[in-house]
Amino acid sequence: MYEDDIRRIALINAYQHEGKADLKSVMGKVMAEIPDLRRDPRSAREMVSRIVDEVNSMSAYEIRETVETRYTSSIRKEKKVEEHRLPDLEGVNGPVVMRMAPSPSGPLHIGHTRMAILNDEYVKRYGGELILRIEDTNPKNIDPDAYHMIPEDLEWLGVNVTKIVIQSDRFDLYYAEAKKLMENGHMYVCTCPREEFKKRKLESIPCKDRDNPPETNLELFDKMIDGTIKEGDAVAVVKTDLKHPNPSVRDWIAFRIIEARHPRVDDKYRVYPMMSFSVAVDDHYLGLTHVLRGKDQLTNTDKQRYIFDYNGWKKPYYYHYGMIKFPGIKLKTSLMKKGILSGQYEGWSDIRLGTVRAFAKRGYRPETFRRYWINSGLREIDAIFSIEIFDSINREIVDPRAYRFSFVKDPVPVRIEGMPNISAKLPLHPTHPEYGFREYEVKGSVYIASRDFAAISEGERIRLKDLCYIRKKGNGIIYDGVEMTEKTKIINWCPEGSRDFSVLKPDGSKDSGLIEPKSSGYRGIAQLERYGYVNFADGDDLAYFTHP
């Protein structure tokens, strides 16, 4: 009498907990919803335990399909809506000016998206400017294509860039600021051998050039620029505190000579600013009000404060969020580039990579990135990226528009003895009948996965999804009607006329089989029933795996 209600509660619980119903939680909800069962709690527990075991024997795909088909209204009622909002920024008295500052070593990867989206969210909240500053001050680590790939990635993410600044256009400004600091005694040119300079810093001993007069430093700096001084023979250094507890902050190098062609400005410059110097100068002249950055930049923030203090500049508000680990995701640009050049990867959008382009090709949506990083917020604690949560967000976004199709991996043909001709009418979406149907005339022959076929026991009743029931008899399969008389295992099938089809997966593997004819011409995200979500991006015969 109550089994249907108990099964509904158990299925929804499993749906909400990654495919496994929790007996204690289900029991509590059953007792709350069905007061009559409280009269005999022992019998009730036995019934609930049996049904929970049945539900937990189902695959995650079966559970999701059943719940989303039968209990949509229930899960909408039970779904906890948790609003996430980024904390307010300090010192906001009007529009803000914020920035993203990637290096042009390649396109953006998933790690960059946090910085981009958090900055974008705050500029949307307060109004103002969001500057894309491309930091190309290391000529040996530049991919020329990155100058257009980075803006393209941001546009796809829905990040509204109001201005693009490229640091290789600003060297004259950096040189002028360096000379001003030298004139005021805050910078000097060091000609010590590299190892000697490093050793002196560690021992808090000043370099022999530290107290040179401004005119000497200015002359040496000009010789660095005009080529008189060779690479490795001199660096320009910002004076700080030689007793600073962090040796990296003590008298840090602000400029070095690099004899390498710059992909964008060729050989126009040979003296290149270090990141902390160019960043401090740009943050001031671009009017930055707030800076969001990872905790790995705390030391650089300390360095940059010296530039602000020496010049009497107003410092922006700094926020340092915790670091995120991305287990199993390839993010190191140099290794990705090496793999592309060697032919290991097909390009920056190869789905084995962690680039924004690869995630887009697999079928992830821009809103997924935004919701994930807003939920993560600006917390200072380190964390591990959860692909499960990321997938769950994307699934919620794409599912309402994802057509359903049947894909049979490693198919075997099955002739069903005694089966009449059946007109199969399968919905393109279980909760959106307005999308239409996939209709087939089935005349006793279908394809099923070899794994499913091998798992059918003698005499076992199996349901071919949305078609009919079958049983195994000896070496054959016989028709067993269309009426549901008991709970049975459900397997997928494809009709005659299905075509060859493959799914490429992010681990580099490929699943091959047959896909039903009605998928022809479809583009975008689809759910291959009892398999997972895929993106049809490159024709009818291939899709990219998105997630379960």
From Swiss-Prot:
The gene is gltX. Belongs to the class-I aminoacyl-tRNA synthetase family. Glutamate--tRNA ligase type 2 subfamily. A motif ('HIGH' region) lies at residues 102-112. PROSITE patterns: AA_TRNA_LIGASE_I. GO terms for cellular component: cytosol; protein-containing complex. The lineage of its organism: Archaea, Methanobacteriati, Thermoplasmatota, Thermoplasmata, Thermoplasmatales. The keyword Disulfide bond does not apply. Catalyzes the attachment of glutamate to tRNA(Glu) in a two-step reaction: glutamate is first activated by ATP to form Glu-AMP and then transferred to the acceptor end of tRNA(Glu). This is Glutamate--tRNA ligase. CDD domains: GluRS_non_core. It catalyses: tRNA(Glu) + L-glutamate + ATP = L-glutamyl-tRNA(Glu) + AMP + diphosphate. One of its GO terms (biological process) is glutamyl-tRNA aminoacylation. It is found in: Cytoplasm. It comes from the Archaea. InterPro entries: aa-tRNA-synth_I_CS (IPR001412), Gln/Glu-tRNA_Ligase (IPR050132), Glu-tRNA-synth_arc/euk (IPR004526), Glu/Gln-tRNA-synth (IPR000924), Glu/Gln-tRNA-synth_Ib_cat-dom (IPR020058), Glu/Gln-tRNA-synth_Ib_codon-bd (IPR020059), Rbsml_bL25/Gln-tRNA_synth_N (IPR020056), Ribosomal_bL25/Gln-tRNA_synth (IPR011035). Its EC number is 6.1.1.17. One of its GO terms (molecular function) is glutamate-tRNA ligase activity. Keywords: Aminoacyl-tRNA synthetase, ATP-binding, Cytoplasm, Ligase, Nucleotide-binding, Protein biosynthesis.
